[in-house]
């Protein structure tokens, strides 16, 4: 009997050993394991931020476009983004038009800035190694097309006063208005610059007669509505020492409304 008791007591410490091994603390997680475990939480927060921003953007864009939010309650995310892009493009066009109407030099500055940026991109692509040739060609082609569109934009036309002198687009000469005798016909602007009497050779240019002068300059002759349509013309000069010349067939007494003082001169 004592032998059995001694055998049982000697075996009890061995049986308790596995329990002490199982209670050891786990090893700390590595950085990669921590990222993997926290990734679902970060993804959930990111989606919540996106949905919150899209909700605010939907409210703003519907208010800006003056649309009823109750009729557009189920807009997709792509629809909200497309509406926002279109609205911003329209705002950009309006701002550009307003800037051009107040300061016509804005378009010239924009062209100069775009051209400078295009030159810098071209210089970088020509010196940078590792850029695919196809990518370089497509990028430069896109910039060239944009530059052509910008160059095709026109300056806004400014309203001209009836008696104001404006340069002729082809010759750069002042526009001189000759009042006619008929009240229903509006005066036609002509460009003239001449130092002497007209010679015999005359050509038609833009509906007017172009008469070359002996000194190499030109004069435009315009028909007066007070006379018949069979060939009477009135030359207008910009030189103060040259009077208003009439053809031999026209008498000064038949045109009281056209005098030297009635012609506006810029000097």
Swiss-Prot record:
Region spans: Disordered: 1-43
Orange domain segment(s): 110-143
Species for this entry: Xenopus laevis
Annotated protein name in UniProt: Transcription factor HES-1-A
Keyword Magnesium listed: no
One Pfam family it belongs to: Hairy_orange
Compartmental location: Nucleus
Molecular function via GO: bHLH transcription factor binding; protein heterodimerization activity; RNA polymerase II cis-regulatory region sequence-specific DNA binding; sequence-specific DNA binding
Domain (bHLH): residue spans on this chain: 34-91
UniProt GO cellular component terms: nucleus
Gene name as annotated: hes1-a
